[in-house]
Every structure is written in C-alpha cells, then in structure tokens.
Amino acid sequence: MRISIVGITGYSGMELLRILLQHPQVEVVSLHASQDREAPVSELYPHLKGICDLKIEAFDSQEIMRRADLVFFATSSGVAKDLSKDFVEVGFPVIDLSGDHRLPGNIYKKWYQKEPAEDHVQKKFIYGLSEFADVRGERFIANPGCYATATELALIPLLQAQAIELDSIIVDAKSGLTGAGKNPAASSHFVHVHDNYVTYKLNQHQHIPEIVQQLQRFDESLQQIQFSTSLIPLNRGIVATVYSKLKEPLTQEELTAIYQECYQEKPFVRIQATLPSLHQVVGTNYTDIGFDYNHVTNILTVVAVLDNLIKGAAGQAVQNMNLMLGFPETDGLLSQPSYV
C-alpha cells in the first residue's frame, strides 16, 4: 500500500511518518507541505538522516493519485476541506487528521470560525473513533481530535450502561504543548508556559460539539457537557478527568466490569486498577483509563490518559487505516512506552 502525507512539517505529520516507516504493509512514497523549495525531509529534520530522505514536495493532487493508493492530511484546520476535494470526487481514499470533516457545516463554521467543507463532501466522511467506528471498506475517514478521543473513550461505557446522570458531566482536560500546534504563538511561548498552568478556550473549545455529537450516538437524550481545557508544560500527553453522578451506587468491581466488557476486544484501551499517569502511554497508541467512585458525594471520577500525537492523532489515523484496509489493527502500532 503506497502512502502520501500532506502536511508533513507539523508535529502530527512527523509522527505519522515515523509510524508509517515502521509499518510492515505500507510504503511512504511522497511527502507534501507548503514551502518555497523542495528539500529532503532529512535536511529539515536531521533525525531522519539515513531513515527517510524523501523530498518534501509541493501539493499536487493528480501527482499524488498517480503515485499513491491513499493520502493522509495532517494539516491545520481549514486546509484539508479544500485540498481533499479532488480525491473525494474520484473516490481516492483520504484520512483527515484535522477537524475539517468531523462536523456538519453550520456547526463547524460556528466553532472553527472558518468556512466549512462542501456539504456533499463532508457527508462522505465517517468519524473514525477506532474502537467504535466500522470503517472497514470505507474511503473517507475523519480522524477524531485528541481531547475528543480521551473524553469519548472515558464516557461511552457509562452511557452504554446507562449508569450516569447526563446533566452532571464535567470534563477537565489537560494537554501537552504539542497539542497547540507548531506555529509560534505567545500562548505557547516558553516563558509563558514553562513552570505555569494555563486554562484556555473555556466553554469555547472546538472539540466540544464533536464530543457531544458522538456521545449522542450512545444516548440521544444527552444535551451538553461542561468542558474545560488547559495547557501543561509537557511536550506530549492528554489527561481527561471526567466527573459525573451515578444513577445508582456501583462498586469498584461493577464499574470495572462495565469498562472491561466494553473494551475487552479493543487492543489499545487498557483498564487500570489504579488511576493512570501519562508515563504509561506517552510514545504509544494506548489509552489508559482508571476510575474511583465517591459514595459520599455520589460522584464518579474517571481519568483517561493518552499521547496526543499518537492515539490523539497519527496513531489513531494509522489504526483507522489498518481497519479500513483489513490489515491487523495493531500493525505498526505496538511501540512500548518509555516510562522515564
């Protein structure tokens, strides 16, 4: 399977290349980005010298379709919706890591403050939360966001079990700095974020409608969630701490059974007996989930952790590719965490 990557110079694009270079069933044939000159990727990123020396090329949809069998878009929001149209029109497989095809046009425009993809194009994309989406044989996948992935994986088992009060859901999500993207900004400047803790986009984060839309698939009576996001001075990682009230008290054993039944055949979700930490998952495609119930307050706390560049982006995109093409789901994705 021949692969092209558009948006190679961003953090997710580089992580996607790293994973695909180790994949047993694919060959990366072209890399694309918006830059003034073509240059070997190893010239711009010396850690790739002798590993990948492909040139970074200007985007050309016809050339990509001539050389590749599938294209990944690891571009900023607002880019893939336009560049992917040529591929969609002829049925050429696309996996989009950005938010451009996750939401209906009117909702996308409100939350992203950008013009949406054309309606007939957006409707062809299936939302690829790998543990719950049936993407086998599909051609167009909208990869979930990093916050959305952690939050949805934490909550879906509880919705399926009808265990929680829907109007009590509060999510406190924290991200490492790569989640803010590569473009320099005052909000991610070293002096601003080092030795600091910054809450941002309170009640305004673009993953809110994505999360609500997907949770409603499991309980359509859910109306809204309370969702906050913060940056923490780490390179990688998402920690989603999810609070909700139970309809009826449950023991730790009963809660564990709910989660294990949901994820028993899902290789990249691990239910932990203790609350998880980021070191357990950084550098991997795993999501680790732990929980604790307070019988005094009737509040269940669920903690989900993942690597925002892997399970929250490039790793899940490859997981979706594997499922789409009928490859073993774990191909290219069985890296182990580096604990320290």
From Swiss-Prot:
**What is an annotated GO biological process for this record, any one?**
L-arginine biosynthetic process
Q: What reaction gets catalysed by this protein?
A: N-acetyl-L-glutamate 5-semialdehyde + phosphate + NADP(+) = N-acetyl-L-glutamyl 5-phosphate + NADPH + H(+)
* Gene Ontology cellular-component terms listed: cytoplasm
Q: What are the GO MF terms of this UniProt record?
A: N-acetyl-gamma-glutamyl-phosphate reductase activity; NAD binding; NADP+ binding
Q: Where is this protein chiefly located?
A: cytoplasm
Which family does the record claim for this protein?
A: Belongs to the NAGSA dehydrogenase family. Type 1 subfamily.
Name of this protein = N-acetyl-gamma-glutamyl-phosphate reductase
What is the name of the gene encoding this protein?
A: argC
